[in-house]
Regions:
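Short glycine/proline- and aromatic-enriched beta-strand/turn motifs that initiate or cap beta-hairpins
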Residues: 22-73
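Short loop/turn motifs that connect adjacent beta-strands in outer-membrane beta-barrel proteins
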Residues: 22-29, 95, 130-135, 168-175, ...
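Cleavable N-terminal export/targeting peptides
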Residues: 1-29
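Transmembrane beta-strand segments that form the barrel wall of outer-membrane beta-barrel proteins
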Residues: 34-40, 63-74, 94-102, 109-111, ...
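Residues that define the transmembrane beta-barrel architecture of outer-membrane proteins
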Residues: 28, 49-53, 60, 77-81, ...
Length: 240
């Protein structure tokens, strides 16, 4: 879901993976990136144990951002296709993302089955404040449509909030700390419990230097107090 990530963009949909290279006279509004991760973690939830590839393309102009992103485990255990749009003004971002999970047998998928009772899409609305003068961010999100249902088939409106802080040691070395919690009984606790802390994350980012080339890398420690689980992941980022 991501973003799933990460890190990708918008603190779970708000971080932009940057390419390190020669500057051009005029930047293109289009971008493309690739993340290689040792496993897929998102908001304290483990989506599989296999290394996962996250390709992404984006378009950004005058505060408007649109993206398409995939998530593919190398053992075939997970597939994901995400689309999203957002708008940023100063320190505030609002957006909508659509997360879709194809089955392992592609011909059985019905991407355009959009009836709220039957669709496999998960549609989320979110708002983010990211400080300009202070390195803090706050994100609140809610699933507003799609497969986020309870056993009775009713929309759960699973909601999540996250508070984070970033500290930069140097231009290429920083650490991000965040705490996230589900706000109601829903997806993040398997519809078993209301408010709970489900994600405590410490992420260190740096760049490996090879002459004039820099390869962004990160290492993350993730703790989910609700599930009593902890994880460690590493990622490489390539800007295209």
């Amino acid at each position: 879901m991501f973003l799933k990530k990460i890190y990708i963009f918008l603190p779970l949909l708000a971080m932009t993976i940057m390419a390190y290279g020669e500057e051009t006279a005029k930047e293109s509004p289009f971008s493309a990136s690739l993340e290689l991760s040792t496993k897929y973690m998102w908001r304290g939830i483990e989506y599989g144990t296999a290394p996962t590839v996250f390709p992404m393309i984006g378009y950004n102009t005058h505060g408007f951002n649109a993206f398409a992103m995939g998530g593919y485990a190398i053992d075939g255990s997970h597939q994901e296709v995400d689309l999203g749009v957002s708008y940023t003004s100063s320190e505030f971002t609002v957006g909508v993302s659509d997360y879709y999970y194809p089955s392992s047998v592609g011909e059985k998928d019905q991407y355009f089955k959009l009836s709220n009772r039957e669709t496999g899409h998960w549609v989320e609305a979110y708002a983010t404040w990211a400080g300009i003068k202070v390195p803090l961010w706050v994100t609140v999100s809610t699933y507003i449509f799609g497969a986020d249902k309870n056993t009775d088939g009713k929309q759960m409106y699973s909601s999540y909030a996250e508070v984070g802080y970033t500290h930069s040691f140097t231009e290429d070395n920083n650490i991000a700390l965040c705490v996230g919690a589900n706000l109601n009984k829903g997806f993040y606790t398997n519809n078993q419990s209301g408010f709970n802390v489900v994600n405590i994350n410490a992420k260190y980012s740096t760049a490996l230097k090879f002459g004039n080339f820099k390869l962004p890398v990160s290492a993350s420690y993730v703790l989910n107090p609700y599930n009593n689980k902890s994880f460690f992941t590493m990622s490489l980022y390539f800007g295209l």
